[in-house]
């Protein structure tokens, strides 16, 4: 199952690679290095034929002795792990776009604290996000630190409703439900999770990544034409169903729980999970083995759909 699951992943990754671009940072492998270097803007990493990033193309002008010195900077590929999104709504007073965030903490550990800062843009039509790494701990004792962290990471949502960061107007939860049922909720990319040399890292999204999401939305109809039953437009359980409150906000179809990129990724995995059955049969597996492997892979897709939603 693991081997054929890897086959599905490789096939899907090849098709999805253009929609999940890998960027490289110019830095040394040894973060404690004292070697001075000029920072550079991140660069898009070209792809190999199999969809994997070709970081060697960016470092082609460096000799092997330079590469072997971990203290010297070079281009380091940081593949995208996940895009973080926030649903948005228009302020009923100033019409600015409000991101719906309960907290702005991206990571809050004793040795690693990452905060998503949020400021009104120049025209106050929305906000500008910025990922802040290495946020210091403030406060003399545990209670003070908790209170300070709460204030620093305060989002736009609370029990009373949604506060506009541009004009301060409070939109009640009923206002939010009205906007949702009128199909006026949007989405905005807030941050990108990447796979660094040692651990997961966070960075700001680039314009190319936001454009890829729009491109993905245009490809969904064609992709799901080859998948039985097409796009998951089936209705969600009613608001009376236990644990299902999203229909109150206009999310009344299964497909509305996913961003276009998430739906594109899920569709590609489904397509190749269906195709793997033929490949397994061609490799001489018995009928029982074919059915067992494909059933386990289908269960894995179900788990993926459960975890990969907005």
What are these regions (language model features)?
Residues 1-310:
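Charged, often flexible domain-edge or linker segments that flank or initiate folded functional domains
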